[in-house]
Swiss-Prot record:
Lineage of the species this protein comes from: Eukaryota, Metazoa, Chordata, Craniata, Vertebrata
Name of the protein: Zinc finger and BTB domain-containing protein 4
One Pfam family from the record: BTB
Keyword hit for Metal-binding: yes
SMART domains (alphabetical): BTB, ZnF_C2H2
Length: 984
């Protein structure tokens, strides 16, 4: 019989070994995981068992079906294995991915760098000695590991040639992998959690074609491999830190290295391996390895796993192993690309918290101070008491199911919101649109919570559009994202709404419609009424400090269709709730914010939030529309530490409400009556409704028409300006109107400067200025001078309002004919006739009048009054040369002296001295620097009117003793004067 023919291939064995090594580097068909140090090495059982008797004995101890012993030894005892539960599992099939979970073998005390070189030698039959063989410590370390594993070719490396004794299988720690050590989302039965078992192709595994020849790590890009090789060469010099000396036969040398000679890991479970310290009354537990302090002992024990070799949290996508689960979670995010940090303003998601913080600072104007933290005694950080959590941490999806890209399609069943697993705001775009499930509307929330289905941290009440199902898919339309605003009272809702949406396809994320903001309102009867009418609230009516939306907020995968609405209609973006924040103490949730709530004296939002008050707010909308069009459509950035609201003038309030105190509001019946009073003259509307520029409000005094009610009220304030009683101690709110061109000036000085222009234009020149004191109780003003009420210039508060108990005030109160009104400077008419029943208002005074002044001697000492008295004509010449623009106010208080010398300087018949203490402290600076001097008689050369003043100076009444008060704060009780700010 001829011998059988044979076909031999000498290159078959190297080719198979080469393919096995490539599969190992790619992670294909690997059924065992070796952990050395902090690195995970995937490998094949058959290759390890064929190359090392150590691995053969260790793998036989945990094999599913025990094999008969090869050398006649007894089978390992079941007590020595920790994988008894896997003995009943069926053998692995021939598929690329076996149904049984891979084994995990931990090699305590084995350095990762040396084991990587040994594993590369097992799969490639080649070994690159560190440093070209010159690094004796590294070569000796590899030789010691080769003798420990029983690899004959590596036993001769280094000094000594001790024979290898296979250790007992119990010395190797084998563990059944739990959920943390499985593959990406693998269960014990071989399927995915929450999904059917899906066979994965080799393309789904990460491809790493560039392995490191020293440690076996593989890289995607060759540049990263070059960088790693440079670090790997430098790290090879420090491999002798495992307790191996440079030479010798002692316990520290490589000759006597065995399992007992290698350094044992530090155990934190056998005894207290920490130091207790007391710092400032706080007990701190300090780690003995890294000296990191912790407040509780449980935190230290949890931290101790970092320093031990028990690294039981391997990465599901690479070879790294972590001591704590959160370390692995943060690391796996870079593999999966999950965006877990979600912005509560625009629902944008980010991979890291730092990217989120940068986004909020750049796009939403969030102050970094709100997100700051404070140091704790143990060296960590804790949030401040008033720190706001402006992000939401989404659950990690890859931990429960394999990571899918959005191109793989949507799940079969529609996703419905759950109380424990929130649905992300941005859904994957699929060819088949999802049908959102509409849950039952729950009760409105007005609390701050951190666990709810909406993609927001702070919960607010349901809005009209959100309750109708206009929200994004997964939110249920019941809740919305959050906006931070200030603590202010609510404001009534407006009647103006969004225009009806056109039946066009949804707008792009960059269109203005997708970036509109709908203010949230409480779900109640008023909201239900608006929904029945098919209306949406108008954005921008409530001036809230909202965050700018970045991109399309409503750009979800499914079509946001609501109940009772067609799918083709353009839905408004999901509403943003409003959160008021009181910095420093607490966060308060409000339903409505208004720009006029910060202005006292106007309507209360709580009183007029009902639906019946909505009809009464329509007349102010045209004016506000014009203001909004001028200001632009940009949202104001949120700055919690700054106020965007300027204080409103006291005279800007409504004339009907000015009589009430500032802090109180009129009753509701009065508000309705006043509003209806403004609407007594209805405008004629055209077929298309009244236009924006139509004037339908007319003044009852001058019949001038105005387009808005607000302008009419401001105009009527000019008619009755300064006639109402202002609060004691507050600055007067009088506005000064020019009698020639009806220009309204805020201050008397501005009115005087404006009046000089008319004085130049008039041919008659400047009229003779006259001082007159109005008398409120005796007589009324003639009808021919009815329009001169705004021309009055209120100089200061009357002496009766001071309440200081001065003698002049007491004399004024005792006299019935005393004038309790403010002195008025005016001119243009004849002085009052003697014996008349009332005062006739004189013409307007064109120049500032300084009644009394005091000079100061610089050498007489500080604060001492100088010589008071009239100034001669020389001062008047100086005034005419300098002009009225250089007249200044006297900066400091000084005493006023009244006597015959003072009264003789005035060409008027003063029958009452009650108003004399009120004066403008206007002085003329001295050219020589000797102080300020009064200039009244020299400036105004008044002609003596025979009807008003006698030829001789009148006999003044007995002078009132006025003691000079001491100079101090709050002690000017007997003397009144008007400061500079009181004129305006």
């Amino acid at each position: 019989m001829p011998p059988p023919a044979e076909v031999t291939d000498p290159s078959h064995a190297p080719a198979v070994l080469r393919q096995l090594n490539e599969q190992r580097l790619r992670g294909l068909f690997c059924d065992v995981t070796l952990i050395a140090g902090d690195t995970k090495f995937p490998a094949h059982r058959s290759v390890l068992a064929a190359s090392s008797p150590f691995f053969r004995e260790a793998l036989l101890a945990s094999a599913p079906l025990p094999l008969p012993p090869v050398t006649g030894g007894s089978a390992p005892s079941p007590a020595t294995t920790t994988a008894a539960s896997s003995s009943s599992s069926p053998p692995p099939p021939a598929s690329p991915h076996s149904s049984s979970p891979p084994r995990v073998l931990e090699l305590p005390g084995v350095p990762a760098a040396a084991f990587s070189d040994v594993l590369n030698f097992i799969y490639s039959a080649r070994l690159a000695l560190p440093g070209g063989g010159g690094d004796g410590a590294a070569v000796a370390e590899i030789g010691a590991l080769g003798r420990r594993l029983g690899i004959s070719r590596l036993q001769g490396l280094g000094e000594g040639g001790d024979t290898w004794v296979p250790p007992a299988p119990s010395s190797m720690v084998t563990s059944e992998p739990n959920e943390d050590s499985l593959g990406p989302g693998l269960r014990t039965d071989g399927g995915w959690e929450g999904d059917k078992a899906e066979p994965l192709t080799p393309d789904s595994q990460p491809r790493r074609p560039f392995p490191c020849p020293r440690c076996g790590k593989s890289f995607i890009h060759p540049k990263r491999l070059q960088t790693h090789e440079a670090q790997c060469r430098r790290g090879s010099n420090t491999r002798g830190s495992a307790g191996l000396g440079p030479g010798g036969s002692g316990p520290g040398g490589p000759a006597g290295v065995d399992a007992s000679a290698l350094p044992q890991p530090v155990s934190f479970r056998d005894g207290p391996e920490h130091v207790v310290k007391v710092v400032g009354g706080h007990v701190l537990y300090v780690c003995a390895a890294c000296e990191r302090s912790y407040v509780t002992l449980s935190s230290l024990k949890r931290h101790s796993n970092v320093h031990s070799w028990r690294r039981k949290y391997p990465c599901r996508y690479c070879e790294k192993v972590f001591a704590l689960a959160e370390y692995r979670t943060k690391h796996e995010v870079w593999h999966t690309g999950e965006r877990r940090y979600q912005c509560i303003f625009c629902w944008e998601t980010f991979v890291t918290y730092y990217n989120l913080k940068t986004h909020q600072r750049a796009f939403h104007g969030i102050s970094p101070g709100l997100l700051a933290s404070e140091k704790t005694p143990n060296g960590g950080y804790k949030p401040k008491l008033n720190t706001l959590k402006l992000y939401r941490l989404l659950p990690m999806r890859a931990a429960k199911r394999p990571y899918k890209t959005y191109s793989q399609g949507a799940p079969e069943a529609p996703l419905s919101p759950s109380l424990h697993t929130p649905v992300p705001a941005v859904m994957p775009a699929s060819p088949q649109p999802l049908l959102p499930s509409v849950p039952e509307p729950g009760p409105p929330h007005s609390v701050i919570t951190f666990a709810h289905p909406a993609p927001s941290v702070i919960v607010h009440g349901s809005s009209s559009s959100g309750a109708a199902g206009g929200g994004p898919v997964g939110t249920g339309g019941s809740q919305a994202a959050s906006v931070i605003t200030y603590t202010t009272p609510p404001r009534p809702p407006k009647k103006r709404e969004y225009p009806p949406p056109p039946p066009e396809p949804a707008a792009t994320p960059t269109s203005p419609a997708s970036t509109a903001v709908i203010p949230a309102t409480a779900a109640g009867p008023a909201t239900a009424t608006e929904e029945a009418k098919g209306r949406n609230l108008r954005a921008g009516r409530t001036l809230t400090y909202t965050a700018k939306p970045v991109g399309g907020v409503s750009g979800s995968g499914g079509s946001p269709t609501g109940t009772g609405r067609g799918s083709s209609q353009l839905q408004a973006p999901p509403p943003l709730c409003q959160i008021t924040v009181r910095i420093g103490e607490e966060a308060i949730v409000k339903r409505r914010i208004s720009e006029t709530d910060l202005r006292p004296g106007e309507l209360s939002g709580e009183e007029v939030e009902e639906s019946e008050e909505e009809e009464e707010e329509e007349e102010e909308e045209d004016q506000e529309d014009q203001e909004e069009s001028k200001a632009g459509g940009e949202d104001q950035l949120w700055r919690p530490y700054y106020s965007y609201k300027p204080k409103r003038k006291a005279g800007a309030t409504a004339s009907g409400l000015s009589g009430l105190p500032r802090g109180r509001r009129p009753p509701r019946w009065r508000q309705k009556l006043e509003r209806r009073g403004w609407e007594e003259t209805p405008a004629v509307e055209g077929p298309g409704g009244r236009g924006r520029g139509e004037r339908r409000h007319r003044c009852g005094d001058c019949a001038q028409a105005f387009a808005t009610l607000r302008k009419l009220r401001k105009h009527q304030e000019a008619h009755s300006g300064g006639s109402h009683n202002s609060r004691t101690g507050r600055r007067s709110s009088t506005r000064f109107t020019c009698p020639h061109c009806a220009k309204v000036c805020k201050t008397a000085a501005a009115l005087n400067r404006h009046g000089q222009r008319h004085a130049v234009e008039r041919p008659g020149g400047t009229p003779t200025p006259v001082i007159a004191y109005s008398k409120g109780s005796i007589g009324t003003r003639p009808t021919d001078v009815k329009e001169e009420a705004p021309q009055e210039m209120q100089v200061s508060s009357s002496s009766g309002e001071a309440g200081g108990g001065s003698a002049a005030a007491a004399a004024a109160e005792a006299s019935e004919s005393a004038s309790l009104q403010d002195p008025v400077i005016s001119g243009g008419e004849e002085p009052p006739v003697a014996g008349g029943g009332g005062y006739v208002y004189p013409p307007v005074q064109e120049f500032p009048l300084a009644l009394i002044g005091g000079s100061r001697d610089p050498g007489a000492g500080k604060g001492k009054p100088g010589n008071e008295g009239p100034v001669g004509a020389s001062e008047g010449n100086r005034m005419e040369e300098m002009g009225t623009a250089k007249v200044t106010f006297y900066p400091e208080p000084y005493p006023l002296v009244y006597g015959p010398q003072l009264l003789a300087a005035y060409p008027y018949n003063f029958s009452n001295l009650a108003a004399l203490p009120v004066a403008l402290n206007m002085v003329l600076p001295d050219e020589k620097g000797g102080g300020a001097l009064p200039f009244l008689p020299g400036v105004f050369g008044y002609a003596v009117n025979p009807q008003t003043a006698p030829p001789t100076p009148p006999t003044p009444p007995p002078p009132l003793p006025l003691p000079v008060p001491p100079k101090g704060v709050g002690e000017m009780t007997g003397v009144e004067r008007t400061q500079k700010g009181d004129v305006g």
